[in-house]
């Protein structure tokens, strides 16, 4: 199938200093959708401080990719000023084509075998106490990149023994044994985002399967109950409140500990439209409902993103588990897993 480039559209046309291939070739045929003006409650500070520049320099010096940049995260200024960055491993090109995502799609390059050590070096240079590592989908790899995740976790622990590690993984769809490899590396937090309610998967996340993702999170707890599990969704894609509440029930049935809910923001005219900007009071209502259903921690605001305030949230997660279970049951579960 031929891909026709719209050279008049500044959002999709190739940059003069970039390869001719468009960033999202599978979206080139889609009609333009107007990008709505953001409401007053969605405002962020433009990046540009000295600490932001230092973080950027460390990322560049190690030839690393961050989801902060690739996904166009609105919180990049705040996070990088704190020397926090979410590392995206296994390249900058994803094998999926989700309609909400700004990450480049196509056929990825071979894995950089030195990348785990490069990430570990950057974590040490930044002095991170808590690091988040995510990846593109790599359906082209036999294990979906599970071994690469494992090697990255091990490298970080070796270089920075006091640093806690949070991972945000793809779904490892049709990759038997992949999840077990990642869990065996013992990340402190295992995050896999549901992204949206099941009724929107066909248009928003067509390469994934809703109940496979639920089962993935459930399986993590079965393999190692001491690992915190986490998942997130976007709202504003046309979902109904009752669908979000049902998703909460599905995640609690999988014993997920932490739920994040944020406003979907449309990256370009070729991406899924924003159906509605959800006001802050509705986010607060979602938070109240989620806590009532038993989540240990909930973050629900328009600018909530999976990795936003991840270090602070990890401390809150540990405190919430301790308050709920007490020190004896927590210690017993750790001993059981390590036995």
From Swiss-Prot:
Residues 80-296 form the Radical SAM core domain. GO terms for molecular function: 4 iron, 4 sulfur cluster binding; lipoate synthase activity; metal ion binding. It comes from the Bacteria. The keyword Transcription does not apply. Keywords: 4Fe-4S, Cytoplasm, Iron, Iron-sulfur, Metal-binding, S-adenosyl-L-methionine, Transferase. It is found in: Cytoplasm. Its main location: cytoplasm. InterPro entries: Aldolase_TIM, Elp3/MiaA/NifB-like_rSAM, Lipoyl_synth, rSAM. Pathway: Protein modification; protein lipoylation via endogenous pathway; protein N(6)-(lipoyl)lysine from octanoyl-[acyl-carrier-protein]: step 2/2. Its EC number is 2.8.1.8. Belongs to the radical SAM superfamily. Lipoyl synthase family. This is Lipoyl synthase. It comes from Methylorubrum extorquens (strain PA1).
């Amino acid at each position: 199938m031929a891909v026709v480039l719209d050279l008049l559209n500044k959002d999709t046309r190739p940059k003069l200093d970039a390869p001719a291939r468009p960033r999202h070739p599978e979206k080139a045929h889609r009609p333009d959708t107007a990008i709505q003006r953001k409401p007053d409650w969605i405002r962020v500070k433009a990046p540009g401080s000295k600490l932001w520049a230092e973080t950027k320099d460390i990322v560049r010096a190690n030839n690393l990719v961050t989801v902060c940049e690739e996904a166009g995260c609105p919180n990049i200024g705040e996070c990088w000023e704190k020397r926090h960055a979410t590392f995206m491993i296994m390249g900058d090109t994803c094998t999926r084509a989700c309609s909400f995502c700004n990450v480049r799609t196509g056929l990825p390059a071979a894995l950089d075998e030195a990348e785990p050590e490069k990430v570990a070096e950057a974590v040490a240079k930044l002095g991170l106490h808590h690091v988040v590592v995510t990846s593109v989908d790599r359906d082209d790899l036999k294990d979906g990149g599970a071994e690469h995740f494992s090697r990255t976790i091990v490298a970080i622990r070796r270089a920075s023994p006091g640093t806690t590690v949070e991972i945000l993984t793809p779904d490892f769809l049709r990759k038997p044994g992949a999840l077990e490899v990642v869990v065996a590396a013992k990340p402190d937090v295992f995050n896999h985002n549901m992204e949206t309610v099941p009724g929107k998967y066909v248009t928003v996340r067509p390469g994934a399967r809703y109940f496979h993702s639920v089962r993935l999170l459930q399986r993590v707890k079965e393999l190692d109950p001491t690992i915190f599990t986490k998942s997130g969704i976007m709202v504003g894609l046309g979902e109904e409140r009752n669908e979000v509440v049902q998703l909460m029930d599905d995640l609690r049935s999988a014993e997920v500990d932490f739920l994040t809910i944020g406003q979907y923001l449309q990256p370009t005219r070729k991406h899924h439209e924003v159906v509605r900007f959800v006001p802050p009071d509705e986010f607060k209502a979602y938070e109240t409902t989620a806590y009532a259903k038993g989540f240990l921690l909930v973050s629900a605001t328009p600018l909530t993103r999976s990795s936003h305030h991840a270090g602070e949230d990890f401390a809150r997660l540990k405190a919430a588990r301790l308050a709920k279970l007490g020190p004896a049951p927590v210690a017993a579960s750790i001993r059981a897993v390590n036995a």
